[in-house]
């Protein structure tokens, strides 16, 4: 889950503010932001087995030449979280953003976009204006989107494997796919870097916990009546909130920050406050209401179940009345590096220690990195993240790729 959810509360407060300053990046796409900072940007598309057309963004190299022993660059793939997009990895200044840091280190950087977000709104046969376009959750992202994007990247680059860095839902989909892997997919992932890793979300805190426990029945009822649809798309209202509140007077920008902290965890001392309007203008990037229902089901269930269609439909789909659980104990063959924090209210410490760490085989956990003061968004937007997380990952991948 990502900073996009801040806009859920902010949009109702948006009013015109003559003092607000508009950053040009508020209205740019990911490739435009990349090019604004002097980096090359490329766009690719891939079609999933169930017909969704996903857009991938690529930074093929940085501003300096880096020579690799075998003549080929290492490939890193970055996957956003819930309600987010490829933009998340580029929204800070270049020396603070993961995508640019890896590009300048000589990596071929690829940024994924899951179905239903700003950049992945197409299907071979379905239209986004129709309900059937939105009948999916992260189940389908893990089953279809993730392997389709990974295979496309490897096809274009001519590599056999890549380094994967995911945040929040971007870790959940990888864990889930690996748990059902027959051994072939795992060989394509050299190393899996899990930022704010998500398994169970039973013990989440803050606004989302309150929503899941006290308003989920109302949300379910709305979903039952109106069916599948789009949830929190990136539109003019969100950009208005980003500009006029997050980019307004100090009292208003502080309000913007505090709403975000209500969702992500305690107030952060490592945000670039001048970039908050940019964050809020690109997130939320949209998802399906059915995906939100699936997350609510996870809060209620306390584990990582497949989507619950109801006992009758579950029997048709799964052969049993209750949805099956993803078995994280079955994950093997990929080295995993965990990055989590006591201050993260979404990838909660209790969920990680009581669920994730008790199920992942210790043999595949290469590193278990614990921070005391990172909230959920700090792993992507925090000013200490480059030194604490990104550059150490660059070093790990560089040594691995060079065979050291």
From Swiss-Prot:
Glycosylated residues, chain numbering: 65, 272
pH dependence as annotated: Optimum pH is acidic.
Signal peptide interval: 1-20
GO CC annotation, single: lysosome
GO biological process: lipid catabolic process
GO MF, one example: hydrolase activity, acting on ester bonds
Primary location recorded for the protein, binned into one broad class: secreted
Function: Lipase that, together with lipl-1, plays a role in the response to nutrient deprivation by controlling lipid metabolism. Specifically, involved in the breakdown of lipids during lipophagy, a process during which lipids contained in lipid droplets that have been delivered to lysosomes by autophagy are degraded.
Name of the featured protein: Lipase lipl-3
Record organism: Caenorhabditis elegans
Name of the coding gene: lipl-3
């Amino acid at each position: 889950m990502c900073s996009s959810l801040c806009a859920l509360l902010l949009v109702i407060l948006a009013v015109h503010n003559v003092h607000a300053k508009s950053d040009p990046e508020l209205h740019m796409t990911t490739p435009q932001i990349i090019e604004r900072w002097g980096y090359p940007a490329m766009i690719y598309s891939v079609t999933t087995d169930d017909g969704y057309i996903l857009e991938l963004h690529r930074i093929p190299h940085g501003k300096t030449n880096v020579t690799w022993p075998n003549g080929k660059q290492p490939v890193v793939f970055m996957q956003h979280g819930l309600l987010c997009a490829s933009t998340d990895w580029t929204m800070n200044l270049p020396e603070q953003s993961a995508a640019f840091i890896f590009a300048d280190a000589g990596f071929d950087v690829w940024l994924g976009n899951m179905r239903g977000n700003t950049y992945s709104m197409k299907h071979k046969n379905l239209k986004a204006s129709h309900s059937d376009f939105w009948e999916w959750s992260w189940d389908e992202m893990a089953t279809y989107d993730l392997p389709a994007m990974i295979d496309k990247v490897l096809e274009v680059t001519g590599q056999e494997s890549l380094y994967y860095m995911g945040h929040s839902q971007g870790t959940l989909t990888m864990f889930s796919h690996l748990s059902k892997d027959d051994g072939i997919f795992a060989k394509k992932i050299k190393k899996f870097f899990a930022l704010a890793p998500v398994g169970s979300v039973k013990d989440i805190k803050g606004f989302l916990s309150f929503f899941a426990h006290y308003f989920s029945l109302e949300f379910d009822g709305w979903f039952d009546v109106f069916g599948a649809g789009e949830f929190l798309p990136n539109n003019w209202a969100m950009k208005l909130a980003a500009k006029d509140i997050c980019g307004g007077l100090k009292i208003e920008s502080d309000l913007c920050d505090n709403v975000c902290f209500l969702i992500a965890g305690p107030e952060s001392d490592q945000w670039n406050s001048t970039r908050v309007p940019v964050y809020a203008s690109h997130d939320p990037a949209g998802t399906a209401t059915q995906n939100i229902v699936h997350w609510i089901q996870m809060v209620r269930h306390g584990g990582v179940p497949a989507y619950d269609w109801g006992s009758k439909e579950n029997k048709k789909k799964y052969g049993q009345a209750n949805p099956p659980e993803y078995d994280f104990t079955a994950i093997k063959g990929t080295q995993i590096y965990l990055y989590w924090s006591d201050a993260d209210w979404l990838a909660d410490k209790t969920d990680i220690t009581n669920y994730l760490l008790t199920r992942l085989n210790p043999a595949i956990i290469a590193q278990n990195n614990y921070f005391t003061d990172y909230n959920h968004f700090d792993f992507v937007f925090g000013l200490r993240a480059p030194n604490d997380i990104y550059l150490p990952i660059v070093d790990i991948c560089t040594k691995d790729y060079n065979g050291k």
